[in-house]
Regions:
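Sec-dependent N-terminal signal peptides
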Residues: 3-16
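Generic cytosolic/nucleocytoplasmic N-terminal low-complexity/intrinsically disordered segments
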Residues: 1-2, 197
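Short S/T/G/P-rich N-terminal loop/turn motif that feeds into the first structured element of a domain
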Residues: 17-228
């Protein structure tokens, strides 16, 4: 049984840096507790001090595979691994204890993962809906995977933000690489953002041929609730 729970990042406007770092917490919220959990998250993260180069996003996960149990996710992301680490280490004290105690009994499970984006395009076109495609890739092939993605993006022109990255902590069942794309609305998300012409279709086919070592694992979609 797959237990894929993975990053999805709501990437902010951090300039042109190619690398972004994330730390994500996934919740399986019990039925009827969604509003209470959303309020607890908002009450805590809307008041917490954080570095200026770090953003936090809270999302629900309405579309996923049958074995993907998480219903919500909290994403922390920054172009600085130091900022991300310092912020995570700062989550302690009385307010933190009240927040975590309030969450108990309202969620069935919780899990954290971390990783980093290695290549991306359209950082100025991040949408509130995001879909992740997860792949199992041997560590020795990670560089080839990112190189193939970067090559594809020279020809393929997506409407929104698209990125490729790796899971560095907390992954399971061999999942190691992710491609993530955002949409501005549900119609755009349902349309899928596939190739718009033969040139893009050929580039996509070449990409799949160049990553024939990768095994597709699963996909899921998140919808942003709040951003901090």
């Amino acid at each position: 049984m797959k237990k894929l729970i993975i990053l999805i990042f709501l990437v902010p406007f951090f300039g042109l840096s190619q690398q972004l770092f994330w730390y994500d917490v996934f919740f399986e919220v019990e039925g009827g507790n969604s509003n209470s959990v959303s309020k607890l998250v908002n009450d805590f993260y809307s008041t917490v001090d954080k570095p200026s180069d770090l953003s936090i996003a809270f999302s629900r996960i309405p579309l996923k595979g049958e074995n993907f149990k998480s219903t919500h996710m909290l994403s922390m992301f920054s172009p600085s691994s130091m900022s991300l680490a310092n912020f995570r280490n700062s989550l302690k004290g009385e307010k933190w204890d009240l927040y975590t105690s309030g969450m108990r009994g309202k969620i069935n499970s919780i899990r954290a993962v971390a990783g980093n984006v290695l290549s991306h395009v359209n950082l100025d076109k991040v949408g509130p809906i995001g879909q992740a495609w997860i792949f199992k890739v041997h560590a020795k092939d990670n560089v080839k995977f990112i190189a193939a993605f970067s090559k594809l993006m020279k020809t393929f022109k997506p409407n929104g933000f698209v990125a490729a990255g790796q899971l560095t902590h907390g992954s399971s069942d061999g999942e190691s690489m992710v491609i993530y794309a955002t949409a501005s609305n549900l119609n755009e998300a349902f349309a899928g953002g596939g190739p718009k012409n033969k040139k893009e279709a050929d580039a996509m086919q070449t990409f799949f041929e160049e990553i024939d070592f990768a095994e597709f694992s699963q996909t899921f979609t998140r919808v942003q609730i709040m951003n901090y």
